[in-house]
Amino acid sequence: MKTYNIVACLMLAFSFVACEKSTDTSTEEIKTSVVSDYTVFMQNNNQLNAVVVNSTGEEIIVENTLASFNDVPSNSLKYRTTLDISYFYTSNCQSNFQWYDASSETTKSIPLFEDLDSCELNVIATAHSSESGFIAYERELLGKDKQFVVRVNSLDQTTASYSEITLDKKPIDIIASGDRLFVLTLDEYVTDNYYLSVIDLDTDIIIMELDLGVDALRLFTNNSGKVIVSYPKLHTTIDPLTLDKEYTTYGENTEPGFITTNDYYMDAAGKLYFHKNMPSAAVTEVPAIYDFEKNSTVVYLFENFLTETELDIKYNIAETTAIAYDDKNNYVLIGYKKNGSADEGGILRITPSPDFKLIDNLDLEGVPQTIFVK
């Protein structure tokens, strides 16, 4: 079995660690003895639905469906944290914001933009806190330049209160940390540079704008709430209070690649679980883990812990679509799509590096998009 540990640091050094590749002998599945529950958001027939999956120690099964979570298109804008997730979507020119708290198993759904025509808006990015939803959008104004706005909408279902902050540049991404909102913007008319607008949520005032240069493409937060600005070849870590910056540069061919992931999970130790594009692998979208403290990436190629028969026939894996970590059992959960079907997938559970043992698999009538561990 062969795996790779890619180390990137400010000195641009890197190293590789490998072990033997899996043979075509069937991999033994190891059963767990600790009960775990997972909430899995899946795509099926262009809609999202959610199920509760239970692991009893003897088997892993779908226990029930979340009846309160439905009618959400699969192409909705998604924003997730460790504990909750929200979706923004527009249907028949009506906008909605649906939020799910995995810790309390509660769902809220609120209408948005009832004062505007949703079909005339281009919503670019969304985020949320425990109290508010944040929606960055642009709209055309007759005879004027485009208007760029962030709307702050209460998640209280009994009130429709909101406020708006006008931006002078196009919003690209948005993220909340503490009592501040961070908006990645692009000056598309003059410099093509990216900027970070810092908004005080107590006053809805932009208190600072940072010049990020070119190719600042995405925002994340780490386990301590610091803001991660992701570039193709590096990332910048920003303290949300002091706005102090730290720079991390990757060596050649050691880029983690989390800038393109559709799903991710940050654990308590500061490791980012994501899926990475590997064009030369048997499955090109694969699980990976980036350790911010060690500045290293472990890439999980399917052919290194599954046999060819398991990969192509038994599990029939086309690509990684979701990822999570079960800290009770020390398992990596890999959601995947099956070959030949748009609406069939499953979840593999494996032990992380250096063991790489297959625990079990669950086939699903849908393609996992996000997994929460209870």
Give the residues covered by each predicted segment.
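Bacterial Sec-dependent N-terminal signal peptides
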Residues: 1-41
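Short beta-strand elements that form the blades of beta-propeller/WD-repeat-like
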Residues: 31-45, 80-92, 131-142, 179-188, ...
